[in-house]
């Protein structure tokens, strides 16, 4: 049972949400009085409460979603709040649906989407993973952060061939290494206000680090927003090459580190927007003609379930007409389908740009 002080804070937070008439978050939409009353006293076996779930969305009323899972059990215990939010965000993933088993499919179906190199600047495919037996950021102790980092770095040090590389802990990182990683756009910063408010940045930078291979086409973030972010990327539009590299890396890491998986929700992550396949396949792409008509761009993107963001990701502008375009759907379809959807959409956008 959650203690009185927590419940009092929850009551205050609920009042604040109710009063915020211009708040458009999914948290506000689905945290009804009856759901709130049903959940406010509950506590996971690791001690997480509804407060851990909603505090970021209460503090940041401009959140799009507004909830995070403090541990794996939270998705089950606080399901009356998470399930409708998941259904709303992952359009059509109903509360009775079950995410399919992992399936990377025929990796040779992926191609270079821009062989002439006129439109696509770079291509990236990433996935998130949580290590079994550990809670998510807000509930991790300093000792757990250190333990996880040592498991991850020793696992990665066994990678061979194209994936072979170096692990750089954030703790005690020299200014030179730091600058080098910033120049390569590899270094992640301490979380933004949304993550800060979710208590995702405790004991920073303990247990956080970055691994990359020698060609800088394969990257792993340790204990950023998720326990692991596994990233494959390169300049140009060869999605096939990028995808194949990611798949081989995930399979290698999984042999040594068991991942948190949920029967219904797929692979578990800190933020419910990343559940399921956890896969985000994206390109940085120049579409000057389509970009002049943002509505048209959004319309085609919507048809292929693509998400259009600014150049530097979420909450940013398109610099020099360069957009970050990715698959929006991560749940209720396989890894193969998620990336295929993105490939089909990008090919269509390029075709339209050429015809304009």
Curated annotation (Swiss-Prot):
Residue ranges of every copy of the Phosphagen kinase N-terminal domain listed in the record: 9-91
* Top-level taxon of origin: Eukaryota
Q: Which GO terms describe its molecular function?
A: arginine kinase activity; ATP binding; creatine kinase activity
Report residues binding L-arginine. 64-68, 225, 271, 314
Q: Which Pfam families match?
A: ATP-gua_Ptrans, ATP-gua_PtransN
Q: Which residues does UniProt call coiled coil?
A: none
EC id: 2.7.3.3
What does the UniProt function comment say about this protein?
Catalyzes the reversible transfer of high energy ATP gamma-phosphate group to L-arginine.
Q: What is this protein called?
A: Arginine kinase Scy s 2
Query: Organism source for this protein?
Result: Scylla serrata (Mud crab)
């Amino acid at each position: 049972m959650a203690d009185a002080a927590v419940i009092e804070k929850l009551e205050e937070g609920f009042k604040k949400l109710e009063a915020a008439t211009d708040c458009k978050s999914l948290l506000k939409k689905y945290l009804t009085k009856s759901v709130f009353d049903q959940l406010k006293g509950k506590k996971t076996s690791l001690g997480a409460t509804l407060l851990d779930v909603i505090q970021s969305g209460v503090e940041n009323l401009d959140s799009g979603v507004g909830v995070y899972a403090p541990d794996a059990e939270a998705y089950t215990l606080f399901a009356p709040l998470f399930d409708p939010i998941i259904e709303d965000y992952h359009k059509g993933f109903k509360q009775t649906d079950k995410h399919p088993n992992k399936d990377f499919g025929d990796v040779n179906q992926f191609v270079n989407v821009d062989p002439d190199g006129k439109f696509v600047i770079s291509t990236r495919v990433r996935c998130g993973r949580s290590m079994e037996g550990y809670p998510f950021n807000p509930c991790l102790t300093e000792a757990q952060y250190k333990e996880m980092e040592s498991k991850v770095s020793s696992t990665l040090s066994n990678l061979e061939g194209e994936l072979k590389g170096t692990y750089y802990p954030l703790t005690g990182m020299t200014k030179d290494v730091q600058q080098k990683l910033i120049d390569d756009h590899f270094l992640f910063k301490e979380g933004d206000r949304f993550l800060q408010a979710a208590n995702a940045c405790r004991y920073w930078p303990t247990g956080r680090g970055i691994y990359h291979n020698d060609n800088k086409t394969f990257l792993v973030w340790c204990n950023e927003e998720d326990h692991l972010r596994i990233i494959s990327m390169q300049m140009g539009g060869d999605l096939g090459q990028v995808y194949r590299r990611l798949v081989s890396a995930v399979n290698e890491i999984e042999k040594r580190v068991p991942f948190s998986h949920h029967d219904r929700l797929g692979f578990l992550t800190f933020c419910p927007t990343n559940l399921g396949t956890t896969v985000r396949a994206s390109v940085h792409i120049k579409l000057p003609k389509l970009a002049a008509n943002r509505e048209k761009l959004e319309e085609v993107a919507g048809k292929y379930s693509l998400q259009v963001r600014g150049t530097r990701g979420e909450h940013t502008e398109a610099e020099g007409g360069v957009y970050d375009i990715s698959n929006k759907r991560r749940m209720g379809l396989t890894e193969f389908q998620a990336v295929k959807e993105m490939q089909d959409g990008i090919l269509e956008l390029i075709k339209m740009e050429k015809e304009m």
